[in-house]
């Protein structure tokens, strides 16, 4: 049987995600971000709610990406997620993209010329942002041009890099309907961005979300809910360079900007430069909020939920892969658990995220 991997955030889960799961074959394993997202923001609803949405709509097994995999630039996000899925035995990776290309060929190219390609990136001027450097590399070696704003295409290339040299086939699915950042309501498939923006419009949600009741009942948060705490974390820290990935230049810019910024959005605007993109700045702010330090990634994989089919698969992995299904006295990943505690502060009605929680079980799909 085919074992298909899907890397996702489901922020929140919508019809486009359901379409992706419907297109996937065999046993479907989702490696999902926890409570903080790749582009450096808190999830609109918590990881358990999003895992349940996925399991109700075709996923067989949902596992959690640790905080320091979830909140990363595309390449590191892709690498960390593929590492986890590879250990869970996937033989194909399905993903949505704005531009369906021969990603398998791109992965083979990276297998062959990866060292040369990375050297090319290292030699590019530091005035370029990391995404600009990566795009220059793909243009040089694969003749790829980047048109407009296509974050899923960028992630797809990160997945191609991550599967290079592994026995995993890539299966791109053409993204349906609205673009990633689109807030347009007049489409067949709405984007997660639009759903977050129109979260109080019930008709809109019912049109585009399969598990709308779960979403409506869940406690929700936005970045601004954490601004007072973020401000405190910045002002009370005498040396921000002790925080993961914060260099001297960024530390100075953030300390200066917090004096006048009245919101997270304003802070991001003030700190962003040509070299430091908004997404990168948001990630740095997420690290500061969660007091992230350089950390070893957990060996064990945290299981958020499964169907009967998923449970059988986990059983077959016993002894080969270290799995955590209940976080108790023994921590799974201290960094992720700390981030979860901070996430809960954004809305006091958010349920406990780790202790006493057990995987969600869905009997039928």
UniProtKB/Swiss-Prot annotation:
Disulfide-bond pairs as recorded: none
Family: Belongs to the TmcAL family.
Main location: cytoplasm
Record's subcellular location: Cytoplasm
Uppermost EC category: ligase
Keywords: ATP-binding, Cytoplasm, Ligase, Nucleotide-binding, RNA-binding, tRNA processing, tRNA-binding
Summary of the function given for this chain in its UniProt record: Catalyzes the formation of N(4)-acetylcytidine (ac(4)C) at the wobble position of elongator tRNA(Met), using acetate and ATP as substrates. First activates an acetate ion to form acetyladenylate (Ac-AMP) and then transfers the acetyl group to tRNA to form ac(4)C34.
Biological process terms in GO annotation: tRNA modification
Organism the protein comes from: Streptococcus pneumoniae (strain ATCC 700669 / Spain 23F-1)
The keyword tRNA processing is annotated on this UniProt entry: yes
UniProt-listed Enzyme Commission number(s): 6.3.4.-
Catalytic reactions on record: cytidine(34) in elongator tRNA(Met) + acetate + ATP = N(4)-acetylcytidine(34) in elongator tRNA(Met) + AMP + diphosphate
MF terms (GO), sorted A to Z: ATP binding; ligase activity, forming carbon-nitrogen bonds; tRNA binding
Protein name: tRNA(Met) cytidine acetate ligase
Binding positions for ATP per the UniProt entry: 7-20, 96, 152, 175
